[in-house]
Amino acid sequence: MANELELKYGCNPNQKPARIFMKDGELPIEVLNGRPGYINLLDAFNSWQLVKELKEATKLPAAASFKHVSPAGAAVAVEMNDTLKKIYFVDDVKLSPLATAYARARGADRMSSYGDFIALSDTCDEETARLINREVSDGVIAPDYTPEALEILKNKRKGTYNVIKIDPAYRPDSIEHKDVFGITFEQGRNELKIDESLLKEMPTQNQVIPADAKRDLIIALITLKYTQSNSVCYAKDGQAIGIGAGQQSRIHCTRLAGNKADIWYLRQHPKVMNLPWIEKIRRADRDNTIDIYISEDYDDVLADGIWQQFFTEKPEVLTREEKRAWLNTMTGVSLGSDAFFPFGDNIERAHKSGVSYIAQPGGSVRDDHVISTCDKYNMVMAFTGIRLFHH
C-alpha cells in the first residue's frame, strides 16, 4: 500500500490536480480494480464506517448503498420473506447472509441507488458479487474478496469497475481536519458508540420497545451518523426503508424520508407485484416505471401509446384510496432523527407511514407537544440526548 493515490480530478473535471494521501504512514486501502474518483472515495470511506458500525452493533453482516456522500440504503442480514425477495428482484438466486444485507440496502430506494457506491462489512462472497454484477453501480469497498467474487467484479463494466479493499484494522486519528476556503477546521472524530443504552429515557406513556424495534432504531441512528444533515431515517425489518438527507427543514426531512418509506411499502401492493411486464425490460426502466405508476403521474406510463412500451396489457390504476388503505396496514416502523423535533407535526407525518418507535435527541422547547402527539398515537419515543449532525 502507498501513502498517496493520484485521482483523475476532484469533485468536477475542472478541479485538478486531485489526490488522496496520508501525512503519516500508508493508505489503508488497495485498489484491486478500476480507477475510483474523488466522490467515489468520499462515498467509500463514509459507507465503510457505516457498515463497520452496523456490524459491531448488531453482530450481523451489513451493507450500504451510497450516493453523493449520503446513504440511499443500509441494512443488516435479516432473512427476507418471499415478498421482499420479489420486489428486490432476488427471488431467483441463492442468498448468503452478506448478499441478503446487500439486497436489502440496494432494494430500499432503487431509484436513488442507481449508480451507487457499495460498502460491505464482510468479505465479499460469490453470491454477493453476482448480485452486484446485475446492478448499475460505480464500485464497492470491502475488507476482502473471495477469488470467485473478485473475478466477477473485475469483469464488470468492461473491466473498469472500481473494487477497493480496506484494512479492517485501520483506525484513524482521534482528531480530524478539513480545509474550507483555505482555512483548516479541526475537531474530534465522532466516535460516539450507538447502542441500546441510548434508548433508556422514554418520556412517553408507552415505554415498550420490542427487540427487533430496538435493532431497527440502532440501524436508523447509525445510518444518520453518516448522512448529510438535516436527516431522518425510517427503518423496519433490519434495514432503512426511507432516508431524508440534506434538508434545511426538519419537517421536510420527515416528509421526504416518509415518502420514500411509503414507496417502499407500496411496491409490495399486489397490483404492483403483479404488473404484466414485457419480456426483457431493462432493470432501470422497470424501476422508473414502478416509481411513476405508484405516483400521481401514473398517466405518464399508462396513457395509450405509452403503456405498450412496458406492459403486455394495460394495468389498472392504483388509486389514491387504494394506496391509502394499503399504507394504513404498515405498522411497527422505527424512526430516527439526527436532531430534535421542534414541533409535533413531524410525529403526525411519521404516523402516516406506520411509525411506532422513535429515537431523537430531545431538548426542544416544545418537547411537551412532541410527547403528547406521540401519546395520541401510542408511540414509544426515546430521548437519546445525542445530536448526529454530519457535514
PLM features: what roles do these ranges have?
Residues S70, C124, K236-Q239, F341, ...:
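Active-site-proximal loop/turn and secondary-structure-junction residues that shape catalytic pockets
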Residues M1-L198, A213-S231:
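Active-site loops and adjacent core secondary-structure elements that bind or stabilize anionic groups
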Residues A57-S65, V163-I166, S229-K236, L266-W277, ...:
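Flexible, glycine/charged-enriched surface loops at secondary-structure junctions
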Residues A72-R110, I241-F340:
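Glycine- and Gly-Pro-enriched alpha-helical subdomains that act as flexible
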Residues I219, T227, Y234-D237, G244, ...:
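Nucleic-acid 5′ end/cap handling module spanning
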Residues E53, Y226, I263-R267, K352, ...:
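Conserved helix-loop functional segments at active or binding sites
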Residues D116, L120-S121, R134-I164, A169-R171, ...:
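C-terminal binding/interaction regions
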Residues K23-R35, A108-Y114, G188-Q207, A284-I306, ...:
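Gly-rich Lys/Arg/Thr-decorated short loops/hinges at beta-loop-alpha junctions or inter-strand turns
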